[in-house]
């Protein structure tokens, strides 16, 4: 498909990216199986966007893609050999059964403190379509991602922007993917990457204890098992964990997403709850001292603002402990509400 054909297709399809109704939830766990693995990627990118530029630059890259959330999520770690130097970025995807759409977020390795607004959409046949909004040079734009030939030997992706509410679209990036391995493996780690979370990479069995009622004076706890699979991303400047928890009543899945903010010299830690897959929670911030990690952030509980604290401790090559606590008095007192003990799988 040439650029003119693509623009015509965008204009014709702009009214909707809805998926066919009645699809079983299980079928969507297969939506991204074609992308799982390691890839060699060929890029073409417009030098300047939305200024009428016709100059394109070509470069190569690599991608590693894992399925998460039982197939209803993915992580997509990328490195690109830009003309200006290596660039790393992380894509996070999650499926929402209520709207029957996928959300896709992007974390720029150069500015990991900011997660870009998601694009949303889905697949029909051999193609995928995802729409969203962004800003460029201070002005609002519409964004369109499209996947083509997803079951072919060389799936390809393209990005287009519009600054006139979708009346006209400019394609500014294309990627062609060639598989190098069916089973994904992490991309190479950078030599200057922080090693704080190296202990967490791999497969774990987890024993959880969770307080039944928070900040209510409760002493009743639920105990259940779970698993974690954690991967390094962003050249070691980030990591992502896929969690399954056998919570009484209904299993819980979620993704822990972490990135090192070099400018502020601390880690950011986000949580994507599989029960609310359209949003990524506000981050905790913190770091490690003397083998103990402490992270703090803000949250809401029963309509009131609270503070949250997470502590990583008891770290050995085969075990670790994670504890979460909440404070309703500005951090003067803390109530521990969740304790997870990790044991590395053989």
Regions found by a protein language model. Give the residues of each.
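N-terminal export signals
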Residues: 5-24
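A glycine-anchored, Pro-Gly-centered beta-turn/N-cap motif
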Residues: 37-38, 200-203
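C-terminal segment of N-terminal export signals and the immediately downstream linker at the start
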Residues: 20-40
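Residue-level recognition of beta-strand termini and adjacent short loop/turns
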Residues: 69, 149-153, 234-235, 316-318
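Conserved Ser/Thr-centered positions that define the repeating blades of beta-propeller domains
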Residues: 160-163, 325-327
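Central antiparallel beta-sheet cores of small beta-barrel/beta-sandwich binding domains
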Residues: 23, 41-144, 207-301, 307-309
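N-terminal pre-domain segments of enzymes
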Residues: 28, 184-192
């Amino acid at each position: 498909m040439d650029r003119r054909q693509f623009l015509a297709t965008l204009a014709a399809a702009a009214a909707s990216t809805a998926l066919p109704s009645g699809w079983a939830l299980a079928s969507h766990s297969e939506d991204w199986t074609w992308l799982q693995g390691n890839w060699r990627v060929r890029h073409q990118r417009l030098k300047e966007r939305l200024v009428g530029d016709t100059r394109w630059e070509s470069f190569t890259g690599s991608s590693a893609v894992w399925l998460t959330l039982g197939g209803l999520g993915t992580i997509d770690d990328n490195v690109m050999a830009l003309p200006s130097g290596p660039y790393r970025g992380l894509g996070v995807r999650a499926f929402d059964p209520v709207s029957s759409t996928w959300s896709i977020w992007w974390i720029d390795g150069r500015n990991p403190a900011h997660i870009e607004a998601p694009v949303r959409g889905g697949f029909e046949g051999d193609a995928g379509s995802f729409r969203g909004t962004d800003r460029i040079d201070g002005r609002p734009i519409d964004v369109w991602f499209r996947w083509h030939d997803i079951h072919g030997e060389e799936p390809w992706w393209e990005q287009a922007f519009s600054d006139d509410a979708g009346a006209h679209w400019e394609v500014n990036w294309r990627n062609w993917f060639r598989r190098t391995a069916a089973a994904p493996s992490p991309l190479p780690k950078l030599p200057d990457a922080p090693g704080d979370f190296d202990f967490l990479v791999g497969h774990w069995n987890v024993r959880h204890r969770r307080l039944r009622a928070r900040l209510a004076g409760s002493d009743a706890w639920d105990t259940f098992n779970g698993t974690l699979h954690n991967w390094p991303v962003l050249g070691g400047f980030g990591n992502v964990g896929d969690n399954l928890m056998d919570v009484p009543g209904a299993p819980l899945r979620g993704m822990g997403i972490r990135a090192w903010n070099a400018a502020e010299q601390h880690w950011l830690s986000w949580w994507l709850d599989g029960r609310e897959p359209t949003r990524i929670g506000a981050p905790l911030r913190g770091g490690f001292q003397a083998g103990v990690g402490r992270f703090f952030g803000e949250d809401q509980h029963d309509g009131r603002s609270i503070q949250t604290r997470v502590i990583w401790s008891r770290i050995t090559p085969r075990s670790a402990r994670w504890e979460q606590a909440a404070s309703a008095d500005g951090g003067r007192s803390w109530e521990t509400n969740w304790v997870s003990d990790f044991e590395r799988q053989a």
